[in-house]
Amino acid sequence: MAGFKVEQDCPQCGGRMNLEETDRLVACTYCGVKNFLYSPGLFRFVMGHNAPGKEIVYVPYLRFKGTVFSCRIQGVSHRIVDFSRLGTPFRNFPFSLGLRPQALKMRFAGPDIQGRFLKCFLTSSDLLEEVTRQTPVERDDSVFHRALIGEAINLIYLPLYGEKGILFDAITNKPIVRIPEKGDVFSTVADSRSVWRLIFLSTLCPKCGWNLEGER
């Protein structure tokens, strides 16, 4: 199951690193320094946009990627899932991200990203319950146990912008929905990014200074 690509600048030399979605132990190809990526909460990613000069509004989507195993009378079956859902109460926005996470490169979200971020009201528990509900079950087929294995849950932000009372997709620049031209419809759901942190932990041995090795 394909994940998405992430662009990140090396905290040591500033060189561009191209990462996989699940990479946590990363090595810079320029300076060779290795770091372990850590976030206190969910990892947050933003999609790049094609609307320079516009005031971007980032809409949150909660995404699950993993395998759903079901234990039935006939045996154990599994289903690979890549599932995203809109995290705000604005139901006129796209309901899911579709294949965009796999098709577009992303960056980690943080205080350095210009624009306004909306709060995510959907919880991880809500998303996992929906993933379970979406798993097909044959009529009169009893499921004794269901497990989600290797799951990765993260937040992905879709960039939008408003112009003349219309909200546009900032990737395709196509209109999505009309919004009031006066007033701020997003003021009550704006999120604070002051606590968003992507932490780089050095992988050098604290005693001898040698590089520690590990899986990505």
Locate each region found by the language model:
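A composition-biased, non-transmembrane "mature-region" signal
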Residues: M1-R216
